[in-house]
């Protein structure tokens, strides 16, 4: 198994010579296996190692136990240890997002800040995702509805992020832990089926492997790799399309002639325009791409709102995507009013809306960015 991971790291050129590796270690079996292997590889591949543990301030004494355990093991193994503490529930309220999203953001912040302290660009951030995580992520995105990018989202190398264990199944990791007598902790939230990913992990994927194919998870991982290659190709073509568009200070103008070309390439070009203007890929989806494509078929003056204060406007010569000004905001929000009836979908300039009225019986309110529950008794002028 050690040789397998070493070969995978070399094959994907994950770690450069004399690099720093910041290993994200939660204390769970996956991250402890990764840390143990990186320690063995440190001398062979010639890199420096540092552990970053993120305390989310969610699980109370259990989270304190995890941090203390990782710090103790790092002391025994001679690895520098950094613990970053955040109050994720409070940050989630402040940032108006779910705790899972806030947790992702603070982890990213922790790694970025620790990397900045290294004063070198020769570093990697090692995460302990395995092949089962890859299969579960593919199933998760597939069930929610996703394009190629979502289905191919977990790769061995993405920028500074590396995933050395992506070649291993979870059962291989369990075997390595026992064989090397590595102590680890178990996050109690991973044992429940309260989260969609846990249901996929504990019920759906095992059932698929039991009833259909025992290597289904492995095949899904290979499919994700193929989709990654397709994603790279279409992204490259989208950038080539964007190179032929007119760049302006506040936006990008996509000429009408471009909308006559391959729609998939045009869609990728639009996604690259979103990234160029916002420096973000998250929160942009096929819905926003379709909104821009629809503008090409509308009359001049039509517009749509996009994430991160961007908007699209139909002009005579094409579709402009750029940052909202005060004048453009007024054009967008005071364009017209819409009636949205319960149980039916309504396509508006702001996107597609659907409403539903139901009796609340104490269910857990979902923390989703585009799904909101409103108390009917508190709505005025209803």
Residue ranges and their predicted role:
Residues 124, 130-297:
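Flexible helical/loop "lid" subdomain adjacent to adenine-nucleotide binding pockets
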Residues 1-206:
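Core alpha/beta nucleotide-donor-binding catalytic domains of modification enzymes
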């Amino acid at each position: 198994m050690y040789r397998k991971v070493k070969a995978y790291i070399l094959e994907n050129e994950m770690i450069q010579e004399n690099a720093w590796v910041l290993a994200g270690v939660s204390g769970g079996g996956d991250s402890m296996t990764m840390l143990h292997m990186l320690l063995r590889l440190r001398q062979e591949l010639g890199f420096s190692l540092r552990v970053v543990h993120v305390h989310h301030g969610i699980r109370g004494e259990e989270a304190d136990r995890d941090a203390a355990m990782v710090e103790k093991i790092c002391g025994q193994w001679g690895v520098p240890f950094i613990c970053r503490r955040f109050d994720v529930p409070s940050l989630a309220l402040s940032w108006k997002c779910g705790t899972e999203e806030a947790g992702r953001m603070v982890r990213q912040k922790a790694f970025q800040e620790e990397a900045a302290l290294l004063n070198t660009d020769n570093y990697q951030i090692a995460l302990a995702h395995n092949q089962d995580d890859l299969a579960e992520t593919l199933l998760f995105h597939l069930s929610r509805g996703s394009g190629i990018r979502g289905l191919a989202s977990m790769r061995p190398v993405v920028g500074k992020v590396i995933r050395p264990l992506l070649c291993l199944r979870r059962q291989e990791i369990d075997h390595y832990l026992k064989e090397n007598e590595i102590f680890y902790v178990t996050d109690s939230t991973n044992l429940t089926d309260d989260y969609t990913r846990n249901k996929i992990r504990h019920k759906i994927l095992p059932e698929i492997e039991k009833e259909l194919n025992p290597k289904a998870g492995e095949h899904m991982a290979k499919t994700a790799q193929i989709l990654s290659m397709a994603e790279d190709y279409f992204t490259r073509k989208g950038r080539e399309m964007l190179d032929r568009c007119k760049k302006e200070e506040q936006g990008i103008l996509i000429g009408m002639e471009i909308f006559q070309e391959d729609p998939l390439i045009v869609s990728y070009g639009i996604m690259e325009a979103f990234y160029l203007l916002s420096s973000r890929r998250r929160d942009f989806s096929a819905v926003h791409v379709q909104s821009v494509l629809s503008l090409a078929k509308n009359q001049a003056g039509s517009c749509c709102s996009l994430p991160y204060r961007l908007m699209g406007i139909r002009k005579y010569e094409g579709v402009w995507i750029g940052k909202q000004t005060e004048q453009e905001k007024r054009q967008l929000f005071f364009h017209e009013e819409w009636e949205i009836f319960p149980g039916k979908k309504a396509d508006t300039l702001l996107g597609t809306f659907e409403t539903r009225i139901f009796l609340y019986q104490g269910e857990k309110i979902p923390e989703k960015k585009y799904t909101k529950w409103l108390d009917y008794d508190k709505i005025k002028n209803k």
